[in-house]
C-alpha cells in the first residue's frame, strides 16, 4: 500500500510546489519586470500621493465632474451587521446587483436615474451606460456618448465653453483593444484629472 501512496504524495508535493509557489512567483516577477505600473495595480499618483487606479471606478458626484456608471456595490451597515447599505465603487465588495430584468427595485432605480439625467439635459437621449451598472460594479470607463452627454452640465458648473469640453473628451477616448475587442471608452478618473488641469490654466 505504501508503494501506491508514495508516488501520489510525491506528485502532490511536486505539483503544489510548482503550481502553488514557483509558477505564481515567476508570473509575479515577470509581470513586475515587464509591466511594473500594471503589476502594481495601475495606480494614479498626483502630488506624491495615490488618488486611485485606472482599473477601478470612483464615485464622482459634483456638478463640475464627469460621473461614471451607477455602481451596485455595498458594504455592511454599521448599525446592523446583518444588513448592507449602498457603497458605490466599494472594491472590497465587487459584484453586480443580482437584480433581474423583472425586478421592481431595478426598474425604480433606473426610472429615478433616467428622470434625473433627462432633467439635467432635456431633449437628448440618455446613453444606456449612465443608467446601467456593470457586472463588477467597479467599471472605470464610460462610453464617449455618456461623457458628451454630461458636457452641458459641466460647462455650466465650471463656466467653460462646451466646445472646449467636447475636445477634452475626444482627446481621452480610448479605441477598441487591438482594434477589435470592446468598445471605444473614456476613463472617468483620467478625464476628471485633465478637467481639473484645464481649470488651473
Curated annotation (Swiss-Prot):
Chief location bin:
membrane
Q: Where are the transmembrane segments?
A: 10-30
One example of the protein's molecular function in GO is: P-type potassium transmembrane transporter activity
Q: Which InterPro entries match?
A: KdpC
Q: Where is this protein found?
A: Cell inner membrane
| Alphabetized UniProt keyword annotations | ATP-binding, Cell inner membrane, Cell membrane, Ion transport, Membrane, Nucleotide-binding, Potassium, Potassium transport, Transmembrane, Transmembrane helix, Transport
A single GO CC term for this protein reads: plasma membrane
- Kindly indicate whether the keyword ATP-binding belongs to this entry: yes
Bilayer topology: Single-pass membrane protein
Domain of life of the organism encoding this protein: Bacteria
Q: How does it assemble?
A: The system is composed of three essential subunits: KdpA, KdpB and KdpC.
Q: Which family does it belong to?
A: Belongs to the KdpC family.
The family database entries (PANTHER family) matched by this protein are listed as: POTASSIUM-TRANSPORTING ATPASE C CHAIN, POTASSIUM-TRANSPORTING ATPASE KDPC SUBUNIT
- Function as written in the Swiss-Prot or TrEMBL entry: Part of the high-affinity ATP-driven potassium transport (or Kdp) system, which catalyzes the hydrolysis of ATP coupled with the electrogenic transport of potassium into the cytoplasm. This subunit acts as a catalytic chaperone that increases the ATP-binding affinity of the ATP-hydrolyzing subunit KdpB by the formation of a transient KdpB/KdpC/ATP ternary complex.
Protein name per the record: Potassium-transporting ATPase KdpC subunit
Q: Which gene encodes it?
A: kdpC
